[in-house]
Amino acid sequence: TGTLSEDVRKKIEAQALFLRSYRYFELVKRYGGVPLILSVQDRKESEVPREKTSVCISQIVNDLSTAATVLPKSWSGSDAGRITRGAALALKGRVLLFYASKQFNRNNDAARWQAAYDANLAAKEQLEKDGYGLNSTYDGTWKDNSDASELSKEVIFSKRYSYPANKSDINAGVRPLDYSQGATGWNQPTLDLVLAYPMADGTVPGVDIDGDGVKEPFDPTATDERGLFWVGRDPRFYKTIVTNGMVYPLADNQYPEQRQFTYKGGEIEIANSTKTGFYSCKFINPVVKKVDVRNYDLDLVEIRYAEVLLNLAECAAEVGNKDPEVYTILKEIRKRAGITANADELYGLKANMTKQELIDAVLFERRIELAYEGKRFWDMRRRMMFSDPEYKGYARERIEIELTDAKKELSLNDLAKDFANGGGESKLNSVDYFKYFKTIVTKIDNKFQWDVDDNHYFFALPKKHLEQNAKLEQTKG
């Protein structure tokens, strides 16, 4: 017998159940059914066949339900950040959302969507009772490494870092090299993502050049307003994307208008510059100076309240007859982002959407709200979107920016001074920009065009595991 109290022992066991569920779900969403090990094995019992996917999901869900009945609503002191009942319920909702999605639910069984809806609604309601909710600002969970941000009411489950024993590289890795040290330039946005963001009023991206109320889509190669694709966008754009000429907002900028130029020949050497023409600024703490950029400990958020809301909205849209609930959630997300309500108070959303339009609206909002949080790839897999005709032969696109003939003789320093003269921000946001720069669109990776069929949505088991366990069968496909 040990010295732990029964209460402490049960809470440790509940956390272990959560972690086992989390790891099993990571396997199941990749491979489908996997060997389900629920007790200590001896060597003779180590070869176990794959279990059915349905059995694995059932075990994961049951374990999370059990954990949620034991875990507290929060932890204090040095235990702050441990797994809570809200985290268990939120993960349960995510698991059932995946299981209801097309990758696992080829016949679109409505009962699975109802179960996913019920689980996510229960998670939302419990989280609200426990004090969770949206932060007042979009970047409130990562704007700095204070407990006020990292343990804010929106954070449900995260990987915690603590300098100097356990440092995080995200703040260093996302920045351009001239603002960081070592390997940088992570999370470089593709043109497709950049063009996807809605406008500041939540409407579809584009510009009404003729004033007739009809928008023309942005065209990065145009030299009129259609080419100013960074102007007037969703506020989340500017907390995620950095385009040529924007100020990268850091405390140790040498001067107020120190801009990030990404044109060819104007940046750091090409081997270390952006491969897409863009940088990301999400997860950046502006007050961290270049010399300290790797001495940092920003937590990595895995589940936040906004995702739970979007999980619920997607399930509500699929279940049907819950349109007001879907609209309420989408408006709440957009209002917090800073999008204007407009006269109809729909924050740019189309009125009276069909069921499919609502589903598409939720998936779109997930793409924008959760950008660079590790969700989009899995959304596309579980929805089997890689097989959609629009992605057949798809290859990622980038922009290449060059100086115009009138400015091509300017050095980077002279260009920066010339651009700043008279107001760099006004030049950046007007057609005066095209006196300095011209843009072309190119493919990033023609060698890797998408061609995914319905048998490619579960990964093959690694050969070494098949060799180590004769009872394992390879994934079909």
What spans do the regions from the language model cover?
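Acidic/polar-rich alpha-helix caps and helix-coil junctions
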Residues: 1-175, 179-184, 205, 209-477
